[in-house]
């Protein structure tokens, strides 16, 4: 069962990669809502986007990703794996979300954003690194504590009679 749950986590990570790839398909400015306010402001100043487009893309991203990811993990854990009760649901949700979080931190943030030009926005190179050490600390903290909280909330919701 553990291997299956890890594979489901890899599947969720693949969905994350797909969302990111679609988001930057016409250039990284398409996902500038994930960047710092300084980068966003520079993009607006350079005429690459507007504050309205940034807000719109952020809302679309949240409206698609959050429900999509929640649906994915719930279908995997309760629909496919048949988890019963809080504990079974919690550990499976936590593993799936943690695997995705590791992929996000190491592969997306660490490699794709940090070591390739795919996420470079022309005219903002002087603002690199786009993900600062402080940002990384916050993401790791949320990724560990936050995913546990999300797993607990979802598991509790699924066990309420």
Regions found by a protein language model. Give the residues of each.
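Long, highly hydrophobic alpha-helical transmembrane signal-anchor segments
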Residues: 1-12, 57-90
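Hydrophobic alpha-helical membrane-embedded segments
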Residues: 6-30, 96-112
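Interfacial loop at the N-terminal end of multi-pass membrane proteins
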Residues: 15-57
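Transmembrane helix-loop junctions in multipass membrane proteins, especially transporters and channels
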Residues: 24-32, 78-82, 109, 113-117, ...
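Short membrane-interface loop/juxtamembrane segments of multi-pass integral membrane proteins
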Residues: 40-54, 120-137
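Loop-to-transmembrane boundary segments
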Residues: 50-64, 131-148
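Membrane-proximal helix-loop-helix units in multi-pass membrane proteins
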Residues: 86-92, 103-124
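Juxtamembrane boundary at the C-terminal end of a transmembrane helix
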Residues: 152-161
């Amino acid at each position: 069962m553990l291997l299956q749950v890890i594979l489901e986590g890899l599947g969720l990570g693949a969905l994350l990669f797909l969302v990111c790839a679609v988001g930057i398909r016409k250039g990284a400015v398409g996902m500038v809502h994930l960047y710092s306010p300084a980068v966003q402001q520079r993009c607006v100043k350079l005429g690459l986007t507007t504050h309205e487009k940034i807000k719109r893309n952020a809302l679309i991203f949240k409206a698609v990703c959050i429900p999509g990811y929640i649906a994915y993990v719930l279908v995997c854990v309760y629909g496919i794996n048949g988890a019963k009760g809080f504990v079974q649901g919690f550990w499976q949700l936590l593993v799936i979300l943690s695997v995705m979080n590791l992929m996000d931190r190491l592969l997306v943030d660490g490699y794709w954003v940090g070591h390739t030009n795919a996420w470079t926005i022309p005219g903002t190179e002087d603002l690199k690194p786009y993900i600062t050490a402080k940002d990384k600390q916050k993401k790791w903290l949320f990724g560990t504590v936050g995913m546990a909280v999300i797993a607990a909330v979802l598991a509790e919701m699924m066990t309420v009679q």
